[in-house]
């Protein structure tokens, strides 16, 4: 039944809790919301993000204010930037009277690419994630994660074969804790430039010839991929801490090859 606006409704979650157990993380997850972002060229791009938002809860408080997480998203105006995401974290902690929290949003991100020979354009989708972590009495950290599909070609197969070499699609996951803003495009390009070849949404026959020969001239083991990308990440001043992983979906096996490498920049 509908309740009159002036009726008293007890706020049960705001009551005291006698168990004296702090909760490190409580909130909402699987919350899908439309999102606008600025791409590397400053143009607006639209997507749908899946949010996970949480705060720490003191031991004496029974529950957090779940509705305020959604209110936080409703209060947004304009495209979300990396700096704006840090502001959202500060607003969330203020709204929920918390000293620690986490915002994670995962979304498909589309980049328009041009085929290497014909020049035809097409969109390619990437999985992207932005994470803001705030611990009590510490500065908030911003992490960017992307999954870039690429082509890898086996150096051993090329060396021992009279013609051809086995190749496959690989997924390279790059995760970077940022010192300053860095575009998704910039992180993706590092992966694509260090792969045997990048992949495209649309290729004509001259383009297919080009990418086939590009991969053949640039063979790399899964170990080569993560090492070459790591060298690029180590020399990126916008990155404080990084991790790179590659999964090669082997075309001659029913399993994947995998490698992971991580480190910190001085």
Swiss-Prot record:
Molecular functions (GO terms): GTP cyclohydrolase I activity
UniProt site (May be catalytically important): 154
Pathways per UniProt: Cofactor biosynthesis; 7,8-dihydroneopterin triphosphate biosynthesis; 7,8-dihydroneopterin triphosphate from GTP: step 1/1
Record field: catalytic activity: GTP + H2O = 7,8-dihydroneopterin 3'-triphosphate + formate + H(+)
Domain of life: Bacteria
EC number: 3.5.4.16
UniProtKB keywords: Hydrolase
Catalytic EC class: hydrolase
A Pfam family it matches: GCHY-1
Its biological purpose: Converts GTP to 7,8-dihydroneopterin triphosphate.
Family: Belongs to the GTP cyclohydrolase IV family.
Protein's name according to its UniProt entry: GTP cyclohydrolase FolE2 1
């Amino acid at each position: 039944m509908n309740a009159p606006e002036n009726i008293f409704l007890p706020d049960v979650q705001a009551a005291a809790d006698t168990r004296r157990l702090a909760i490190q993380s409580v909130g909402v997850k699987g919350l899908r919301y439309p999102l606008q972002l600025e791409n590397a060229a400053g143009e607006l791009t639209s997507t749908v993000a899946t949010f996970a938002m949480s705060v720490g809860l003191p031991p004496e408080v029974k529950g957090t204010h779940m509705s305020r997480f959604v209110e936080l998203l409703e209060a947004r105006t304009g495209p979300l930037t990396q700096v704006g995401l840090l502001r959202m974290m500060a607003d969330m902690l203020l709204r929920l009277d918390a000293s620690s929290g986490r915002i994670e949003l995962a979304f498909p991100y589309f980049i328009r690419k041009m085929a290497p020979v014909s020049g035809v354009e097409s969109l390619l989708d990437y999985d992207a994630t932005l994470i803001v972590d705030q611990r009590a009495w510490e500065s908030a950290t911003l992490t960017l994660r992307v999954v870039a599909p690429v082509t890898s070609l086996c150096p051993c197969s090329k060396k021992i074969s009279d013609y051809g070499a086995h190749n496959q699609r690989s997924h390279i996951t790059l995760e970077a804790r940022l010192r300053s803003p860095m575009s998704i495009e910039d992180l993706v390009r590092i992966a694509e430039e260090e792969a045997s070849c990048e992949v495209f949404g649309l290729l004509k026959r001259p383009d297919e010839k080009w990418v086939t020969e590009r991969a053949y001239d640039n063979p790399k083991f899964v170990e080569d991929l993560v090492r070459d990308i790591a060298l690029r990440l180590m020399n990126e001043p916008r990155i404080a801490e990084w991790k790179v992983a590659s999964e090669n979906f082997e075309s001659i096996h029913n399993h994947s090859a995998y490698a992971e490498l991580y480190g910190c920049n001085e």
